[in-house]
Amino acid sequence: MDKELLQSTVRKVLDEMRQRPIPLGVSNRHIHLSAQDYERLFPGHPISEKKALLQPGQYAAEQTVTLVGPKGQLKNVRLLGPLRSVSQVEISRTDARTLGIAAPLRMSGNLKGTPGIRLVSPFAELELPSGVIVAQRHIHMSPLDALILRVSHGDMVSVAIEGDDRGLIFNNVAIRVSPDMRLEMHIDTDEANAAGADNPHAFARLVGPR
């Protein structure tokens, strides 16, 4: 195989890889807890795994809490593990209206100036002073995925949701690159409902910047 043919073949393979479907993960409301807050809410009860998630080492725990806001509450909100350094609550816009909380759109971990909420477990209550957000839609990927897709950590891209009669293009999708991450797009339940993505055939496809 001559050099020109080899280069052409490589370009074709890479183009096909850039068009491959991106797995879609729909994130229902959930919480992340610090070790200190977990011990206050579940004293003497070790965190236990209910279901492994796609991202390595992450899982849905057996433990749940009730979120209590100024206007309402949401029960059976799942804890995701492992425990973190700072507690965080991720809800949808619809959830925020139910609770009566003005939760800002943020990337995970960007909690400065966010509202708090009361957490109620079967054993205790905890007033979280801050940490409630509506999560920015994003795509997790490895450095190799980023190289193939020609994107970098922190980029904003546009993504088409396909596999359903409705479909939708989402702009302002953040790229999150980490060596221990697998390729997966995360959207919340409001976004999934709008795109008709609440079915096993739905997937995402990168269509351009922003």
UniProtKB/Swiss-Prot annotation:
It holds the Pfam family PTAC. Induction: BMC production is induced by growth on 1,2-PD vitamin B12 medium. It is found in: Bacterial microcompartment. Its EC number is 2.3.1.222. It catalyses: propanoyl-CoA + phosphate = propanoyl phosphate + CoA. Keywords: Acyltransferase, Bacterial microcompartment, Metal-binding, Transferase, Zinc. GO terms for molecular function: acyltransferase activity, transferring groups other than amino-acyl groups; metal ion binding. The N-terminal 20 residues target foreign proteins (tested with eGFP) to the BMC. Formed by 2 beta-barrels, each is capped on both ends by short alpha-helices. NCBIfam families: PRK15070.1. Monomer, when purified in the absence of the encapsulation peptide (EP, residues 1-27). The EP may influence oligomerization. This is Phosphate propanoyltransferase. It comes from Salmonella typhimurium (strain LT2 / SGSC1412 / ATCC 700720). The lineage of its organism: Bacteria, Pseudomonadati, Pseudomonadota, Gammaproteobacteria, Enterobacterales.
